[in-house]
């Protein structure tokens, strides 16, 4: 069986001493025994008439490229001589898949729905000739689909540098759009390799050094009729950088991109995952999400994103390497496709409250459906990506909370969030175990300002000790300062403090307005000024700022006041604590008329000075006239000791609650770090209120 289109093949035919020679041709040679006629591209592959001595059959193949048609004719010749009939040959040829990594098309995980998606093809083309052939093979299909042809390509490091500009020129000349990215840079700088490629291109190309992001950007930015060629790596399942190989497969990233584009969403929790979602199998210090694939499948998950395939699970899996890093890359790529007015919120204290205030303002401005905000405190390297992945083209404004407890974390989060406005709310004594000094905290939170665009706006308190540092980090970008000084861009005066809130006049560059804030404490008024400054920075009218602040209500665990049946207040500030936030909360408690009790749990992550810090807040409670201090846990006991008479330390929650009940009626403030779980005290008090109410109602009915 010989190729009649090849000059050497024709010579073999003429010289062959075989009893029977079968010639095949894609050029329609009448002398050939097996021919491809009426060869043309379709939307999903090639169509041609397979002509043999037995007759003709129409063939649709997902293989692309004329060379693959020739390969099919060769196979047809072999099968024919083995005695297969034409209809059987046609069925088999139509079902053949490409060799891995050679013009191999990629499909999404099947979700049972029909979606119009671009065609994605992976090819190993890493030489000029191979790249030219691959693009040429796909051009006719792009034309048949009435779409564009996009090429994502790069060149390997430590290899022939002369071919780089040549390949760049081929891609620019033959494809409609090109994204230049990394291949296997090996020991070379990827940016230098990209520069070499760009030298052969007539115009400056689109560059995305992260290959995963380049693939996501290409697939998500394409029209359904488009064809995308991912060239260079083909079937490879790794990427080599500086001598280290990490798991990377173009086909897996393209599969995820297509599956996401079908409308799939992500979940990291098998307890809450829903049908059709993708389970991201994160690996932590205690649990490995890869061990929970069967649970995800039982909940109806469509597939799992894993670091490496778990063959024991039947759940479809997409292998993206380190899943935590994959989540960050996915979120960064998704964020780059959306352009809402985005505000990032950092700081030691008040982040979540200020974020909720801003969210209330944004809702007043553009409505619920057009605004996005961080849910709860999902502010780490899992929560921030999940929040960004909720972005849609309908969102006009967003506020994202960025949290940290180690150096370098804000850099990671700000890099994917890419805000237009960034707030540093304050710098206080938090995470001292890892950051050691308040200045280190100020620098870490302030690092968000470096990720603002040149047109971005930095927002921070003008009277903070580190205001000059934040101005320096802002570089030449515009700055908005807030606080109680009349020289600041956003400030307040005519302040009237009430037990459950504050009223004041707020001054902004837009003008002045009366504001009623339904949250107690001067620190919450500061948060409101920060929110107003951020909102002004993204263009929110003053009337919407006022409406949004008026509509704000404290969230559970964050200075959330609620009335007790005895007429006193329970202030739930149990979400978190550091020395400065405890002092601010004590100030609020001290302003209330009547007996007051502080219930304090341990303050976590405050470093070697923990004992002194707890003693400090205990002494401050005494100084401010708080009537009693009850503490829970060994660390918090230092606060009770410093408080003196009226300070009681407990290690048992039930004993503390009984003592608290015995000392009521009184205003009660409950505060502590997450690790102290002081919300248990709040729940116990609420349960007690409910029990007392039921008893009263029962006595009334008996009477």
Where are these regions (language model features)?
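Extended acidic/charged loop-beta regions that coordinate divalent cations
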Residues: 7-56, 95, 99-110, 390-430, ...
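Phosphate-binding loop of NTP-binding sites
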Residues: 2-4, 10-17, 52, 73, ...
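Beta-strand->loop->alpha-helix junctions that form or flank phosphate-binding loops
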Residues: 18-42, 60-66, 90-95, 104, ...
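Nucleotide phosphate-binding/pyrophosphate-handling subdomain across enzymes
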Residues: 43, 53-177, 199, 264, ...
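N-terminal leader/targeting and accessory segments in enzymes
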Residues: 7-8, 32-37, 64, 84, ...
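Short glycine-rich anion-binding loops that position phosphate/pyrophosphate groups of nucleotides
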Residues: 5-7, 126-127, 155-158, 184-185, ...
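C-terminal helical cap/extension that packs against the catalytic core
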Residues: 117, 167-224, 304-314, 574, ...
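Residue-level signal for inorganic ion chemistry
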Residues: 1, 36, 71, 75, ...
């Amino acid at each position: 069986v010989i190729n009649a289109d090849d000059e050497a093949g024709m010579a073999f035919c003429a010289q062959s001493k075989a009893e029977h020679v079968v010639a095949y041709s894609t050029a329609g040679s009448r002398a050939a025994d097996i021919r491809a006629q009426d060869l043309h591209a379709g939307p999903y592959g090639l169509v041609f008439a397979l002509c043999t001595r037995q007759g003709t059959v129409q063939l649709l193949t997902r293989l692309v490229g004329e060379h693959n048609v020739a390969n099919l004719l060769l196979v047809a010749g072999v099968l024919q001589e083995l005695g297969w009939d034409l209809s059987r040959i046609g069925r088999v040829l139509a079902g053949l898949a490409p060799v891995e990594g050679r013009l191999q098309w990629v499909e999404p995980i099947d979700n049972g729905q029909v979606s119009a998606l671009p065609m994605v093809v992976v090819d190993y083309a890493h030489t000029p000739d191979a790249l030219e052939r691959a693009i040429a093979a796909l051009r006719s299909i792009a034309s048949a689909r009435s779409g564009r042809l996009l090429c994502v390509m790069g060149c390997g490091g430590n290899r022939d540098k002369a071919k780089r500009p040549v390949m760049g020129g081929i891609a620019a000349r033959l494809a409609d759009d090109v994204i230049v990215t990394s291949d296997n840079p090996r020991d070379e700088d990827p940016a230098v390799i990209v520069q070499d490629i760009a030298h052969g291109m007539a115009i400056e190309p689109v560059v995305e050094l992260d290959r995963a992001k380049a693939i996501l950007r290409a697939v998500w930015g394409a029209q359904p009729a488009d064809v995308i060629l991912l060239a260079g790596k083909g079937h490879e399942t790794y990427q080599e950088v500086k001598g280290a190989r990490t798991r990377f497969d173009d086909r897996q990233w393209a599969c995820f991109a297509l599956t996401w584009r079908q409308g799939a969403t992500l979940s990291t929790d098998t307890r809450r995952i829903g049908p059709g979602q993708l389970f991201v199998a994160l690996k932590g210090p205690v649990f490995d999400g890869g061990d929970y694939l069967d649970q995800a499948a039982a909940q109806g998950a469509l597939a799992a994103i894993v670091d490496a395939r778990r063959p024991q699970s039947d759940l479809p899996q997409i292998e993206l390497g380190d899943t935590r890093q994959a989540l960050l890359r996915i979120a960064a790529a998704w964020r780059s496709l959306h352009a809402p007015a985005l505000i990032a919120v950092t700081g030691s204290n008040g982040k979540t409250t200020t974020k909720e205030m801003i969210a209330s303002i944004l809702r007043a401005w553009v409505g619920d459906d057009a605004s996005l905000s961080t849910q709860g405190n999902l502010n780490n390297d899992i929560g921030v990506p999940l929040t960004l992945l909720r972005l849609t083209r309908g969102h006009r404004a967003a506020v994202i909370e960025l949290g940290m407890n180690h150096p370098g974390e804000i850099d990671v989060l700000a890099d994917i969030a890419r805000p237009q406005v960034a707030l540093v709310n304050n710098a206080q004594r938090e995470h001292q175990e890892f950051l050691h000094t308040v200045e280190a905290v100020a620098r870490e939170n302030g690092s968000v300002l470096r990720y603002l665009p040149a047109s971005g706006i930095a927002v921070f308190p003008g009277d903070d000790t580190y205001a000059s540092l934040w101005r320096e980090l802002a570089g030449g970008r515009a700055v908005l300062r807030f606080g109680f000084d009349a020289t600041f861009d956003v400030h307040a005066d005519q302040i009237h403090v009430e037990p459950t809130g504050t009223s004041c006049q707020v001054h902004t560059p837009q003008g002045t307005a009366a504001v009623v804030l339904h949250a107690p404490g001067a620190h919450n008024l500061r948060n409101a000024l920060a929110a107003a400054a951020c909102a002004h920075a993204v263009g929110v009218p003053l009337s919407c700022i006022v409406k949004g602040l008026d509509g704000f209500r404290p969230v559970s665990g964050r200075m959330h006041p609620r009335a007790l049946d005895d007429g006193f207040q329970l202030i739930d500030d149990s979400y978190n604590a550091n020395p400065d936030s405890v002092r601010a909360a004590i100030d609020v408690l001290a302003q209330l008329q009547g007996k007051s009790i502080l219930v304090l749990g341990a303050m976590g992550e405050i470093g070697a000075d923990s004992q002194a810090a707890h003693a400090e807040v205990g002494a401050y409670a005494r100084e401010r006239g708080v009537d009693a201090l009850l503490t829970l846990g060994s660390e918090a006991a230092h606060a009770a000791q410093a408080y003196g008479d009226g300070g009681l330390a407990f290690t048992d929650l039930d004993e503390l609650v009984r003592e608290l009940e015995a000392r009521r009626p009184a205003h009660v403030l409950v505060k502590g770090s997450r690790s102290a779980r002081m919300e248990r005290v709040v729940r116990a008090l609420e349960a007690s209120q409910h029990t007392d109410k039921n008893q009263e109602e029962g006595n009334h009915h008996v009477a």
